[in-house]
Amino acid sequence: MTASFDVIVIGGGHAGCEAAAASARTGARTALVTHRFATIGAMSCNPAIGGLGKGHLVREVDALDGLMARIADAGGIQFRMLNRRKGPAVRGPRAQEDRKLYAAAMQAAIRETANLEVIDGEADDLIVSGGRIAGVRLTDGRRIKSAAVVVTTGTFLRGLIHLGEKSWPAGRVDEAPALGLSASFERIGFALGRLKTGTPPRLDGTTIDWAAVEMQPGDDPPEPFSVLTARITTPQIQCGITRTTPATHDLIRTNVHRSPIYSGQITSSGPRYCPSIEDKVVRFGDRDGHQVFLEPEGLDDATVYPNGISTSLPEEVQLAILATIPGLENVKMTRPGYAIEYDHVDPRELEPTLQTRRMRGLFLAGQINGTTGYEEAAAQGLVAGLNAALAAGGGDPVVFDRADGYLGVMIDDLVTRGITEPYRMFTSRAEYRLTLRADNADQRLTDRGIALGCVGAGRAAYHRAKMAALQAAKQGAMSLSVTPNEAARHGLSLNRDGHRRSAFELLSYPEIGWREVAAIWPELSAIDPAIAEHLEIDAKYDVYLKRQAADVEAFRRDEGLVLTEIDYSAVPGLSNEARNRLEKAQPLTVGQAGRLDGITPAALGILAAYLRREARQRTAASA
């Protein structure tokens, strides 16, 4: 018997869960195909969510009513705002997670999602009909029909684990790889590449000398990821910090030839910003130590994740390395670290909707696109699932651009520039950082999510109430004003120019905060502290945001110049190099062309002039 759905999502990891939930929220009948329901929401590597750049993505997923932020709040056992001493634009919320609580909360959310059915099984082949996707076939022979398919296979595509001189096929420890899907992609015509990632050994926390390491508490009170989380109720823990030693490095150098990375056993690229401890020692030979963060994996689990010493050295070498690190001299290793290689698709095969250019109805999200990290996967999954549902229902696709959010920055980087190593999000990748802050993700995206039909009624009502409160607070702050002399009586030093300044303008001064303006106007104390914080940040950035708005307008002007179906050989003045690069990349807009390597401002000017001339000629011909 053949089942039928609007959308099928393959894989129950972070990308798959968001894709399936986003599709279902729009009303599309959605199937989530995964090996076992019990592995949904599993944290394959580090037990943490968020971080610099990554925390922005989590907040953006939340703004579109995605799952990750709320699940991370439910399972979070230590919350920290990274870069707190810096400006709000580059702060990154992060949470240490209890693996069991996180997975349980995700499974409950998936189970409770309307229009979503979980199917235990392994997708083995993509069904194609009439040049577009038509469904999937499972390894047990079952066929499932659909108008759209989202593939979110993580490290499972022809996954191969490496541990010292040993290697074996696996998607992750104790789970089989997905072999049939890789062959299916190749039959369709996709050229698959190989990437590598790794994980550290796991430790028995009861055998760690915690007195010998620095302890790191979380923020008090903890700040949630989701705007819908009133407060964190899960018990909070501390993490530990220790360092490798010269003895550690000597041991690694002595055995580096046994690492698959250096023996030639692994030839694929790994994540630049999350290198193995072997890589750190070889690449940074002048360092006498590297930080190791000891991260508990749960409230009732003694397992500790030593963040910073990912390795694929033989098991006995890993144990010897641990014994050279302060606090870990007598530690017991519950599972060795390892490296894993897996297939990926060149993300330049994708449209900004995350639909493949080669096959209509086929969408990809997560590590299959060359990214690394739970948060990057979740954001892609949401966009892919949303667009798959829109495609299945005959709706117009949605594209998030670089001025919309970090999810737009990431997707544009992937589909325009491609990757040579696993892609990780950082705040430095975004041109419009002042606009794209973690604290204003809902202000930027939730209204759009409501219009797209992926935001539930409860969040929509909360959002409208919050925006109304913020607008009222801003109007109130702008209606109150003081002269410099009046401000001086309250201890505030302003330029004695006689000009009255509103409470909102006063908040733009670096040395003036909400407490100072509330001391002048006590009625402001009635404003909700969360709204007051938003208002102060908006005031601090107001001048800069107005300047950035002009940059965004220019960016969107270039994005509006569409390059589809253009014959570059007919564009006079383009160099052969520019013409070749444009023909190969097939950018969708002049803005996207400008982000390609080797495309000069002069070439962009020629393209823009050509498009405008063509538009004038079409207008004249139709007159």
Curated annotation (Swiss-Prot):
Annotated residues for binding of NAD(+): 270-284
Keywords: Cytoplasm, FAD, Flavoprotein, NAD, tRNA processing
Binding site for FAD: 11-16
Cofactor: FAD
GO cellular component: cytosol
Record localization: Cytoplasm
Main localization (coarse): cytoplasm
Coiled-coil annotated residue ranges, if any: none
Top-level taxon in the UniProt lineage: Bacteria
The keyword Transcription belongs to this UniProt entry's keyword annotation: no
Pfam families linked to this entry: GIDA, GIDA_C_1st, SAM_GIDA_C
PROSITE patterns attached to this UniProt entry: GIDA_1, GIDA_2
GO MF terms, alphabetically ordered: flavin adenine dinucleotide binding
GO biological process: tRNA methylation; tRNA wobble uridine modification
Family per similarity comment: Belongs to the MnmG family.
Reported function: NAD-binding protein involved in the addition of a carboxymethylaminomethyl (cmnm) group at the wobble position (U34) of certain tRNAs, forming tRNA-cmnm(5)s(2)U34.
Oligomer and partners: Homodimer. Heterotetramer of two MnmE and two MnmG subunits.
Name of this protein: tRNA uridine 5-carboxymethylaminomethyl modification enzyme MnmG
